[in-house]
Amino acid sequence: ALMLGMGAVLPEPEYELPLSGEGEAAVYVVGRISGEGSDRKPAPGDFQLTKTEIRDILACREKYAKFLLVLNVGGVVDLSPVMEVGNILLLSQTGMTIGDSFADVLLGKAYPSGKLASTWAKWEEYCPVGEFAQPDDTRYNEGIYVGYRYFDSVGKEPLFPFGFGLGYTTFEVGRPQVEVAGTQVRVTVPVKNTGAALGKEVVQLYVSLPSGKLDQPYQVLAAFGKTGQLAPGQEEALILTFALERLASFDESTAASVLEAGDYLLRLGTSSRDTRLCGVVRLEGEVMVRQLSHVGGKPDFEDWKPENPSRVQEDLAGVPVFPVKPEAYQPKLIP
């Protein structure tokens, strides 16, 4: 069969589902059609839940002691009307064996251990910039403020932050050890399963760049790693590494990717909103990482910037500082 209208909003079905509360558990599945070549719409049945979905989800939560909301979707859905639901499984659209995978997770033969690759928020909380009406003349006014970079930089609270995700157990992220050798940053951190079930955890390393002449978001994801399967009480040392030059920013005035002098704050955690400061890389001078050239001309618009960026004065007392000389870098010329 050929289905036309990818990304279309289907009409809401009309039905009356008797919810007596009988049985031990209830599962409610929210589905969406995915597509490409068009934006999501702030409408019920697409980005937003329909009245019927909200009604039935809240009814199931009220009448069943064990209730699971399953999201068989390819993108974000505004869950703000049903945030009181305690168990939400993001199944996504993972192919023809999705039913087998879901059954394994539901019956305890497998466990969820993923993390969100996008920020989930109310529709009105997303960055109100961009002109995407014409596919052959698109102005990406949002600049660097895409996804979590926007939410973290302007201080807006999402429903679920970038990198968030729970499983059937809990974890403790221990005290990290930071090492800096030349341009390489290495963070070793112990992760312990403190719950009663098997599981895996993902640890994420973010970096806040110095605020110099170039505009910067509050933080950027520099590295992440996932443990192997950990039994209750089991611990693993996770190693995260990245090269500082990967954080270089483009300077339009010189057509070069540069690292500005200053403090690069290392933040370790399990989501973009759950981090702690674990180290500072102090670059003692500006570094030109790559010399490029202007070949596409200058755009006819200015990138959007927040009026009041979410920047706080960090207390660096007790935080290890690693000085780095600019001479540690070898610039590259890209014609």
Where are these regions (language model features)?
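C-terminal non-catalytic regions of proteins with extracellular/luminal or membrane-system context
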Residues: 1-335
